[in-house]
């Protein structure tokens, strides 16, 4: 017998939400459930009390049903999360294996590369901070290199050391680097030293891995032009410049930052070719363009190019890279 809501006075009414539940609970019972029976009020109260318990159970069941889609969505999100975690773990394992393989392919070079930090008193603090960043870049590049060099920091102290301590004391845990307070002449034989300076008349053609090449750790914006060359002469050590002018035409005469010189040497050790090494490192803002095999600049037309920053170091760029306007080369029809 179907149940219908009754609102007549003196008769018990059952909440519509409870109908189905009450009906199902009385299924199979020989005594039919009648909502609109004329029961006394005391009997109605007892039935109302029963209804509350049943209502609580019903609401709980209803809440469960209402949240079915939410639970389904949560299970889906959980599965997706586990899937992403498995993918991330797999990628991590691949990267780890790749790094292991890469480290197995690394062949350290015997070449020693020294950053001379003895110019501390010639730099303002802002330039010392720049040098600190360049040194950190050198260290990071050397750690990733196929042929890492034997990296030295010499005459380490003063403002530079204080700034490195302030910036991040983690440098004391750096690996595969020799950080020394001593001058390089007290650490390495004089005949093995070669100062890389843009003012040297000597031009490197190859790198001798039995030598120790020195990069001047100086950020001076050309305020102390030629100081590294003079220092090499005073100490009576060999000097040379990178063969940049044989392969590259620059839009201005600018010396390279410490990290650029360092990266060019790392690139040459890997590629064994100066031109490729230069163009894999030189920033575009320096307006570098290749020379032809005859050593002449191809026919080009002037174009606008954003001016770069001042040079950061007095190290090793070939001075024959003379001032030229920024250019864009056109392909010539034969």
From Swiss-Prot:
Q: Name one GO molecular function term.
A: tRNA (guanosine(9)-N1)-methyltransferase activity
Entries under CDD domains matching the protein: Trm10euk_A (cd18101)
Basic and acidic residues bias locations? 85-98
Compositionally skewed regions (Acidic residues) per UniProt = 305-317
Q: Where is the composition biased (Basic residues)?
A: 71-84
Tell me what reaction this enzyme catalyses.
guanosine(9) in tRNA + S-adenosyl-L-methionine = N(1)-methylguanosine(9) in tRNA + S-adenosyl-L-homocysteine + H(+)
Coiled-coil boundaries: 62-94
Which biological process annotations from GO are given for this protein? Answer: methylation
Provide the SAM-dependent MTase TRM10-type domain boundaries: 98-289
Q: What is its EC number?
A: 2.1.1.221
UniProt cross-references to Pfam families, sorted A to Z: tRNA_m1G_MT
> Spans of biased composition, class Polar residues?
26-40
Q: Give the span(s) annotated as Disordered.
A: 1-101, 290-334
Q: What family classification does the UniProt entry report for this protein?
A: Belongs to the class IV-like SAM-binding methyltransferase superfamily. TRM10 family.
Q: What is its biological role?
A: S-adenosyl-L-methionine-dependent guanine N(1)-methyltransferase that catalyzes the formation of N(1)-methylguanine at position 9 (m1G9) in tRNAs. Probably not able to catalyze formation of N(1)-methyladenine at position 9 (m1A9) in tRNAs.
Q: What is this protein called?
A: tRNA methyltransferase 10 homolog A
Q: Which organism is it from?
A: Xenopus tropicalis (Western clawed frog)
